[in-house]
Regions:
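Conserved motor-coupling elements within RecA-like helicase/translocase cores
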Residues: 367-383
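ATP-dependent helicase/translocase motor core
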Residues: 2-333, 337, 341-360, 378-383
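Extended, non-catalytic scaffold segments that flank or surround catalytic motifs
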Residues: 360-366
């Protein structure tokens, strides 16, 4: 990446692609050329990696059962494109419910979030995907794809740093318009997207509007903001794509509304201030509860920084990632707002987030009496 900072104006896109891949390798991804993968161009999974991971982490499954599970994931696209994306994402995070030959249903994990080294991390370039256009076979070839256990979790589109006419907007159009139109079967497995021209590097989802793709300006909380050309790329790779960090973001910081609202096609990934805020708030709350200090802490967020989503990410952390802390257990979370605008904003988000929060019912209380009734009627859970 250092040599990119001194490029002489004659860089081509392929050289930037090679440098980007090399940097991903430096943080733990293993390179594999797309043309070296034994597959049909209509297939978008790396079968060998998928089956190897299942054999390692679910050794009780027979080879033919692993094959059956692979086919379940491979043939996932029966609903709308967005509903399929949402369904597959839930499989990746929660596992797939599968019934082996013994007849006892089990959840089979597709990714090991607790032990990252059990996963197979691949960075793949020039991965050709075939589609039919007016009866003719044609192909698309995304610049870079990140595979975990044979599944393409993130698509990265790069533009030439030396070409003033090649912009990250073009990269965004390539993903959100052309790829969805021509090769949706690939994007069914790709919740995340990254666009970069070297100077600007932005993170979003495959459904994110262009204006909501954002830079990731810190690797760790407290770091100096990265603002120089090519620093954005380095910070993005180290701050988002280091494998352990990538799994953390992928598991808890990608937001989908409840399945019944899939028609809205809403998918959001956190911005870096939301990620670090939710992390620090969780740590502070856990410390306060365990030590019984009553000092949870205060978080200041500027107008428009996405505080409501920060609270959603925090609530998910408290609900799902504190199971080993008996003092927290299955918490009941109360969110108090001081403006009608925030009340409406909160209702709009949280009422459609039962699956994301995993806390059960989401209620809106009108006054203290109503709140006492709500709290008195439950021993745990609820928002």
């Amino acid at each position: 990446m250092a040599k990119l900072k001194n490029y002489n104006g004659r860089y081509c896109e392929s050289e930037y692609e090679s440098a980007f891949i090399a940097f991903l390798e430096s943080v733990g991804w293993h390179y594999l050329a797309g043309n070296q993968i034994p597959r049909s161009y209509s297939e978008v999974l790396i079968a060998e990696d998928f089956k190897a991971f299942i054999a390692k982490t679910s050794p009780g499954l027979l080879p033919e059962e692993t094959e059956q599970l692979y086919d379940t994931v491979r043939l996932a696209g029966a609903e709308s494109d967005f509903s399929t994306l949402h369904k597959v994402y839930k499989w990746m995070v929660d596992g797939v419910q599968f019934t082996p030959q013994n007849g006892l249903s089990i959840m089979v994990p597709l990714i090991d979030f607790e032990t990252p080294e059990n996963n197979i991390f691949r960075v793949v370039n020039q991965f050709t995907v075939e589609y039919i256009n007016n009866g003719q076979r044609e192909t698309r070839r995304p610049d870079v794809l990140l595979f975990v256990n044979g599944m393409p979790l993130c698509v990265i589109e790069l533009k030439n740093p030396a070409d003033a006419n090649a912009t990250i907007y073009d990269a965004w159009e390539q993903i959100t318009i052309r790829y969805w139109r021509d090769i949706p079967q690939l994007l069914h497995y790709c919740p995340l997207a990254c666009i970069s021209d070297g100077v600007k590097t932005r993170l979003g989802t495959v459904r994110t509007p262009y204006e909501h793709f954002y830079a990731w300006r810190r690797v760790n909380d407290g770091d100096k903001l990265s603002t120089m050309p090519f620093e954005e790329t380095e910070t993005m790779v180290r701050g988002v794509y280091a494998p352990e960090r990538f799994l953390e973001i992928f598991r808890d910081y990608i937001y989908f509304q409840d399945e019944i609202f899939d028609c809205d096609e809403r998918e959001i990934v956190c911005r870096y201030p939301q990620f670090f805020a939710a992390r620090l708030l969780k740590q502070s709350i856990v410390k306060s509860v365990v030590e019984q200090t009553g000092k949870g802490g205060t978080y200041f967020g500027a107008t428009g920084c996405g505080k409501t989503y920060t609270m959603a990410f925090l609530a998910r952390q408290l609900s799902l990632r504190c199971g080993d802390i008996p003092q927290i257990g299955s918490p009941t979370i109360v969110m108090i707002v001081d403006r009608e605008e925030l009340q409406e904003q909160g209702i709009k988000l949280f009422a459609k987030s039962k699956e994301f929060l995993n806390l059960g019912d989401v209620s809106v209380v009108k006054d203290r009496k109503h709140l006492r009734q709500e709290l008195g009627a439950r021993e745990s859970g609820g928002f």
